[in-house]
Amino acid sequence: MESTKEKATPAETFGEYIFGDAAMKKYLTAKTYDSLRRTIDEGKQIDPEISAEVAEAMKNWAISLGATHYTHWFQPLTGTTAGKHEAFLDFCGKDGAIMRLSGKNLVVGEPDASSFPTDGARATCAARGYTAWDPTSPAFVKEGTLFIPAVFVSYTGETLDKKAPLLKSITALNTQTKRILKLFGTSCKKVF
């Protein structure tokens, strides 16, 4: 039996599983949206005041698409991808359970990196590392999991992934390109 509901075209569903502009506008207040946009567009640090609202919005958006878990997704130096999956479900004793993603858990994840593959790059006892959300790459939902793009660094600040050096390079190129453009009388907030 054929459904009476019309099938959506690829153009209508394009970007549906990405926490992009349309989802941000729908799930965030205007003030928080503007602050997050500045973070993304200008490479600014995320305002800690908005992290809880962004986390709640991202969680609600992901759940609406069938997600039950989230992971800080990164590319370690091993040439693979990695992430630790966490459930949104959080038990509350006698009261049952709630679905939760805190601002802190959105911004920083996995304080003990001993569970991540290293290809012998470090000893397990030196495995204290952190994932940090990279808001310049959009979060997305795939197969019931919210993937939060992240960088991976050691507790001493050493890069343990392939993305952090790329982001540093983009920042350096942006700074120098803006400097050169200024010499020619053009100013801008961001080039890349």
What are these regions (language model features)?
Residues A8-A127:
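Active-site core of metal-dependent hydrolases
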Residues R128-F192:
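Glycine-rich, acidic/polar active-site loops that bind/position phosphate-bearing ligands
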Residues E2-E6, M24-K26, A57, A139-I148:
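Short, functional N-terminal and low-complexity linear motifs
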